UniProtKB/Swiss-Prot annotation:
Phenotype when the gene is knocked out: Dwarf phenotype and shriveled infertile grains.
All ranges on the Vesicular side of the membrane: 297-303
Cellular component, GO annotation: endomembrane system; plasma membrane; SNARE complex
UniProt tissue specificity: Expressed in roots, stems, leaf blades, leaf sheaths and panicles.
Taxonomic source organism: Oryza sativa subsp. japonica (Rice)
Gene Ontology biological-process annotations: exocytosis; intracellular protein transport; vesicle docking; vesicle fusion
InterPro entries, sorted: SNARE, Syntaxin, Syntaxin/epimorphin_CS, Syntaxin_N, T_SNARE_dom
Sequence segments annotated as region (Disordered): 1-28, 107-132
Superkingdom of the organism of origin: Eukaryota
TM spans (from-to): 276-296
Major subcellular site: membrane
Localization annotation: Cell membrane
The name this protein goes by in its record: Syntaxin-132
Annotated gene: SYP132
Family of the protein in this entry: Belongs to the syntaxin family.
Length: 303
């Protein structure tokens, strides 16, 4: 990213920063202005990379949980996932704080010579900040997708457990009640009498542990969503602003191109008009000469 933004501001070969300062009224080199800014951007992107790594760990743990049939195993996975989600919350808050600082820094930077609103430096900073915020929003969306997946897969697992124990598929009301309360012993009363209490109680304990895990994980993921909400609003607003700027630039470019085309056509018409005027004058002169010759008839005088 550093190369992408700083290459546009490199001095011409053979030139010196001092000469540039004199020509620009002792303004700072734009590439120097961006160096500190890009370090802050890199720090935020490093945090986003950590969020991505934690997201993958949570997705893997969620896949593992589908095959678990023991309460203690489910509890161990839950503890791992809770630890990772807590870490996600910590990193997300850090990232949000750094983005807020970046935006404040962008505003204060506009007070520097040559860095005012709309300048090349200002546009680069704004666009880069917007891109970083967009990445954070995308990661936020990924965590919410994970939350929905955990909830749906929990429902699927509960249905399978009831079917495995009872031999019949539960209706939606039964599944909803299990998801809401986690209490399944009453549903398995007949199976307990037929298969024995010990074996069924393992399934009951696993369903209860899974219920508690999903409830706690969902609560933590909802807390994450709140952390990102303000940022999402800012990203959308800045996205609209950047789109408007791009639209205005595109419209201005189109108008300029139309103007150039019209000017070229006018020059072409003017050139053609002059050419035909010359032809008309020559033709008129020829006609005049013919008339004069016809009137004077110099060949008769000679005779």
């Amino acid at each position: 990213m550093n190369n992408l933004l700083t290459d546009s501001f490199e001095l011409p070969r053979g030139g010196s920063s001092r000469d540039g300062d004199i020509e620009m009224g002792m303004q700072a080199d734009p590439s120097d202005n961006l160096k500190g800014f890009l370090k802050k951007v890199d720090a935020i992107e490093s945090l986003i990379a950590k969020l991505t790594n934690l997201l993958h760990k949570l997705q893997t743990a969620n896949e593992e949980s589908k095959a678990v049939t023991k309460a203690r195993d489910m509890k161990a996975i839950k503890q791992r996932m809770e630890k990772d989600i807590d870490e996600v919350g910590k990193i997300a808050r850090m990232a949000k704080t750094k983005v807020d600082e970046l935006e404040k820094d962008n505003l204060s930077n506009r007070q520097k010579p040559g860095c005012g609103k709309g300048s090349a430096v200002d546009r680069s900073r704004e666009q880069t900040t917007g891109a970083v915020k967009k990445k954070l929003k995308e990661r936020m969306d990924d965590f919410q997708v994970l939350r929905e997946a955990i909830r749906q897969e929990y429902r699927d697992v509960v249905e399978r457990r009831v079917f495995t124990v009872t031999g019949s598929r539960p209706d939606e009301e039964t599944v909803d009640n299990l998801i809401e309360t986690g209490r399944s012993e009453q549903i398995f009363q007949e199976a307990i009498q037929q298969q024995g209490r010990g074996q069924i109680l393992d399934t009951v304990a696993e369903i209860q542990e899974r219920h508690d895990a999903v409830r706690d994980l969902e609560r933590k993921l909802l807390e994450l969503q709140q952390i990102f909400m303000d940022m999402a609003v800012l990203v959308d607003a800045q996205g609209d602003m950047i789109n408007n700027i791009e639209t205005h630039v595109s419209n201005a470019t189109n108008h300029i191109q139309q103007g150039v085309s019209a000017l070229q056509n006018a020059k072409k018409l003017q050139k053609n008009s002059r050419k035909w005027m010359c032809y008309a004058i020559i033709l008129l002169l020829i006609i005049v000469v013919i008339i004069v010759v016809a009137v004077i008839q110099p060949w008769k005088k000679g005779a």
